[in-house]
Amino acid sequence: MIQMQTNLDVADNSGARRVQCIKVLGGSHRRYAGIGDIIKVTVKEAIPRGKVKKGDVLNAVVVRTRKGVRRADGSTIRFDGNAAVMLNANKQPIGTRIFGPVTRELRSENFMKIISLAPEVL
């Protein structure tokens, strides 16, 4: 459950370390984003010589949330923190590696590149 002003960890090697959500995309009054939703973020902390730098405004897809995701069988998958993967203008990941697990729900949102790069799909 991500909303405006939420700080997220970055789960790829794009060069960003922490980002802040500045808008939830998908409707003029949409308040919350969950796993698989695209948000607009600004880079708050970045590493030197990375692909993105502090202050950049990018799209990102949410891959892990503390709120978790509810499955059809009644189970819930929760994570210890909120994390996102940076996207370019074509909705493709900027980084070439994904860190940490991601959920199967990204498959239904057609983020197959993220699924294939992830070390573990829950």
Curated annotation (Swiss-Prot):
* MF term (GO), any: large ribosomal subunit rRNA binding
**Presence of the UniProt keyword Membrane in the record:** no
Q: Which SMART domains match?
A: Ribosomal_L14
Q: Does the keyword Ribosomal protein apply?
A: yes
**What does the record list as GO biological process?**
translation
Keywords in alphabetical order, please. Answer: Ribonucleoprotein, Ribosomal protein, RNA-binding, rRNA-binding
Q: Which CDD domains match?
A: Ribosomal_uL14
Question: From what superkingdom does this record's organism come?
Answer: Bacteria
User: Which InterPro entries has this protein been placed in?
Assistant: Ribosomal_uL14, Ribosomal_uL14_bac-type, Ribosomal_uL14_sf
GO CC field: cytosolic large ribosomal subunit
* Record-stated family: Belongs to the universal ribosomal protein uL14 family.
Matches recorded under PANTHER family: 50S/60S RIBOSOMAL PROTEIN L14/L23, LARGE RIBOSOMAL SUBUNIT PROTEIN UL14M
> What is this protein for, i.e. what is its function?
Binds to 23S rRNA. Forms part of two intersubunit bridges in the 70S ribosome.
Protein name as it appears in the record: Large ribosomal subunit protein uL14
Q: Per the UniProt entry, what species is this protein from, by scientific name?
A: Alteromonas mediterranea (strain DSM 17117 / CIP 110805 / LMG 28347 / Deep ecotype)
Q: What is the lineage of its organism?
A: Bacteria, Pseudomonadati, Pseudomonadota, Gammaproteobacteria, Alteromonadales
Q: Which gene encodes it?
A: rplN
